[in-house]
Amino acid sequence: MTNIRKTHPLLKILNSSLVDLPAPSSLTSWWNFGSLLGICLAVQILTGLFLAMHYTSDTATAFNSVTHICRDVNYGWVLRYLHANGASMFFICLYLHVGRGLYYGSYTYTETWNIGILLLFAVMATAFMGYVLPWGQMSFWGATVITNLLSAIPYIGTDLVQWIWGGFSVDKATLTRFFAFHFLLPFIIAALVMVHLLFLHETGSNNPTGIPSDLDMIPFHPYYTIKDILGLLIMLTALSTLVLFSPDLLGDPDNYTPANPLNTPPHIKPEWYFLFAYAILRSIPNKLGGVLALVLSILILAIVPMLHTSKQQSMIFRPLSQCLFWLLVADLLTLTWIGGQPVEYPYVIIGQAASILYFSIILIFMPLISSVENHLLKW
């Protein structure tokens, strides 16, 4: 008799995705982050659901409701800090996942890659709106500054900003709609994840060598399930250590002050995972130019497949491209540091140089070096 997991209409979908899925035998730990992101999403949805049971999206009570969750709700502080630091873990895994895709040339699977970029935008939008909900100083001013950027759009900008605000400033209407969208978006993200996996399983996984692995496949279970469980344990250890020992390490102290429209904080900055994009935004003196650079800093990923000039898919056998890749990583870390610094000399000039380098590496140097490598290999 055939196993039920292979015949049942629902179970056979799970079976072909998680149990009997043929996977390349050479996948390294860099391929763990997809499953870790799935776990992060589940953790965020669950903790968020319980937080939403106690949160009130009203400007008069939002800040106090978060305090109430931490002080009066059973293990409310664990829920709150798991959710806040879970977002940081989510972004760490996201950036490593994208980095892996860039390094090993996974972007050649364009449908999967483009859905991934869409997912990245959706997660960033969700995180931004979530940061507004505690209604602290940084929440309020962050929302004001970032939504105000849309006013740079010619002709419709001002109307668009007021439409998003639901008035003439960030107020009760803004907070309520941000809460509604913050609750809704993770479920849209979950649906997009299914589409992401659907396209991935059409082509099969890439592997570190970048060479087709159809001749050498192994079943996903037990080999990669046990590998994913190890990755999960490491991530959960890191997350629980962060939550239990220094929950505010990655947060901003200003957010423990209730929002006050009459008092601007000395340095308005987003959460750490947006600092690189914020630095690129600030490095251009023109408002519209800054907004365009901000959007392009992520959207540039969409044209990476078109800029692939190498005859090899992966970077594993391309030392010159590897040097450029790690230069890009160092550049992004520099931008992240600059994003958290005040707008003054020498930070401004460093930020501008790092921003130019970021776009130059992706648009000019990567394709150029790939062509040079082809030439050196006489291809």
UniProtKB/Swiss-Prot annotation:
Membrane topology recorded in Swiss-Prot or TrEMBL: Multi-pass membrane protein
Gene Ontology molecular function, alphabetical: metal ion binding; ubiquinol-cytochrome-c reductase activity
Residue positions binding heme b b566: H97, H196
Transmembrane segments: 33-53, 77-98, 113-133, 178-198, 226-246, 288-308, 320-340, 347-367
Stored PROSITE patterns: CYTB_CTER, CYTB_NTER
Example GO BP: mitochondrial electron transport, ubiquinol to cytochrome c
Domain of life: Eukaryota
Binding, a ubiquinone: H201
Cofactor binding mode and count: Binds 2 heme b groups non-covalently.
UniProt keyword terms in alphabetical order: Electron transport, Heme, Iron, Membrane, Metal-binding, Mitochondrion, Mitochondrion inner membrane, Respiratory chain, Transmembrane, Transmembrane helix, Transport, Ubiquinone
InterPro entries: Cyt_b/b6_C (IPR005798), Cyt_b/b6_C_sf (IPR036150), Cyt_b/b6_N (IPR005797), Cytb/b6-like_sf (IPR027387), Cytochrome_b (IPR030689), Cytochrome_b_C_euk/bac (IPR048260), Cytochrome_b_N_euk/bac (IPR048259), Di-haem_cyt_TM (IPR016174)
Subcellular location: Mitochondrion inner membrane
Gene Ontology CC: mitochondrial inner membrane; respiratory chain complex III
Alphabetical list of Pfam families matching this protein: Cytochrom_B_C, Cytochrome_B
Residues annotated as binding heme b b562: H83, H182
Reported cofactor(s): heme b
Miscellaneous remark of the record: Heme 1 (or BL or b562) is low-potential and absorbs at about 562 nm, and heme 2 (or BH or b566) is high-potential and absorbs at about 566 nm.
Family: Belongs to the cytochrome b family.
Function per UniProt: Component of the ubiquinol-cytochrome c reductase complex (complex III or cytochrome b-c1 complex) that is part of the mitochondrial respiratory chain. The b-c1 complex mediates electron transfer from ubiquinol to cytochrome c. Contributes to the generation of a proton gradient across the mitochondrial membrane that is then used for ATP synthesis.
Subunit composition and interactions: The cytochrome bc1 complex contains 11 subunits: 3 respiratory subunits (MT-CYB, CYC1 and UQCRFS1), 2 core proteins (UQCRC1 and UQCRC2) and 6 low-molecular weight proteins (UQCRH/QCR6, UQCRB/QCR7, UQCRQ/QCR8, UQCR10/QCR9, UQCR11/QCR10 and a cleavage product of UQCRFS1). This cytochrome bc1 complex then forms a dimer.
Name of the protein in question: Cytochrome b
Organism: Micronycteris hirsuta
Lineage, opening ranks: Eukaryota, Metazoa, Chordata, Craniata, Vertebrata
